Curated annotation (Swiss-Prot):
<dbReference type="InterPro" id="IPR008555">
    <property type="entry name" value="SIKE"/>
</dbReference>
<dbReference type="GO" id="GO:0090443">
    <property type="term" value="C:FAR/SIN/STRIPAK complex"/>
</dbReference>
<comment type="similarity">
    <text>Belongs to the SIKE family.</text>
</comment>
<comment type="subunit">
    <text>Interacts with IKBKE and TBK1 via its coiled coil region. Interaction with TBK1 is disrupted upon viral infection or TLR3 stimulation. Interacts with CDC42BPB. Associates with the STRIPAK core complex composed of PP2A catalytic and scaffolding subunits, the striatins (PP2A regulatory subunits), the striatin-associated proteins MOB4, STRIP1 and STRIP2, PDCD10 and members of the STE20 kinases, such as STK24 and STK26.</text>
</comment>
<keyword id="KW-0963">Cytoplasm</keyword>
<dbReference type="GO" id="GO:0030674">
    <property type="term" value="F:protein-macromolecule adaptor activity"/>
</dbReference>
<comment type="function">
    <text>Suppressor of IKK-epsilon. Associates with the striatin-interacting phosphatase and kinase (STRIPAK) core complex, forming the extended (SIKE1:SLMAP)STRIPAK complex. The (SIKE1:SLMAP)STRIPAK complex dephosphorylates STK3 leading to the inhibition of Hippo signaling and the control of cell growth.</text>
</comment>
<protein>
    <recommendedName>
        <fullName>Suppressor of IKBKE 1</fullName>
    </recommendedName>
</protein>
<keyword id="KW-0175">Coiled coil</keyword>
<dbReference type="GO" id="GO:0005737">
    <property type="term" value="C:cytoplasm"/>
</dbReference>
<feature type="coiled-coil region">
    <location>
        <begin position="154"/>
        <end position="192"/>
    </location>
</feature>
<dbReference type="Pfam" id="PF05769">
    <property type="entry name" value="SIKE"/>
</dbReference>
<dbReference type="GO" id="GO:0035331">
    <property type="term" value="P:negative regulation of hippo signaling"/>
</dbReference>
<feature type="coiled-coil region">
    <location>
        <begin position="4"/>
        <end position="32"/>
    </location>
</feature>
């Protein structure tokens, strides 16, 4: 039982570390979107006389913005499902340990009642000593399981909060990327119109 409880504690720690990594990845995604937005805003301020290299960067950003949000969204959803499944498995394992402990306590109480009812002639002190030792061990196990239960409840709550925040951030990122693509489309259309107008003016000359 001790080895299994230690494993549950270790799994809970691993889960918390994964949630932290998950949050860091979301923060990185937000930073990337912010940089992308600033670059597009800077390009917009340049005007119709945008250098050729900025036009190439616009095309690259447009292509990247089409692929990155969808791929990252799929990855985040997969990670959330995995974490939720892992939480469920750990919680079921904890419930099994609690049930096993309750079963042990039930058998112990039954044996003690039988011992008292039968009045087996045995030295009093050894019986009391064994009773104290066994009770102490059970109390330690109960305390550890309570600690594990609290840790698991906190981990599950943290997982649910993180999942909600990540979904909200991803939705915001998708909206921002959609707006960026619209801006890029307008800028490209403006560049094409300006180019055609310049060619037309040149041909008239």
């Amino acid at each position: 039982m001790t080895c299994t409880i230690d494993k549950i504690l270790q799994d809970a720690k691993t889960l918390l570390e994964r949630l932290k990594d998950h949050d860091n990845a979301a923060e990185s995604l937000i930073d990337q979107s912010s940089v992308l937005h600033k670059r597009v805003k800077a390009m917009k301020e340049v005007g119709t006389a945008m250098p050729e290299k900025y036009q190439e960067e616009l095309a690259e950003i447009k292509d990247a913005s089409k692929l990155r949000p969808h791929v990252l969204l799929c990855q985040e959803n997969t990670q959330i499902r995995d974490l939720q499944l892992e939480n469920k498995e750990l919680w079921l394992s904890l419930e099994e340990h609690q049930y096993a402990l309750e079963l042990i306590m039930s058998k112990y109480r039954k044996q003690m009642l039988q011992l008292i009812a039968n009045k087996i002639p045995a030295p009093t002190e050894p019986v009391l000593e064994a009773h104290k030792t066994f009770s102490s061990d059970l109390e330690c196990q109960i305390d550890r399981i309570c600690v594990i239960g609290d840790a698991m409840r906190k981990a599950i709550q943290l997982d649910e909060d993180q999942a909600y925040n990540i979904q909200e951030r991803l939705a915001q990122l998708e909206l921002e990327n959609k707006e960026l693509r619209e801006i890029l489309s307008v800028r490209n259309e403006s560049l094409r119109s300006s180019k055609k107008e310049s060619e037309w003016n040149f041909s008239e000359k």
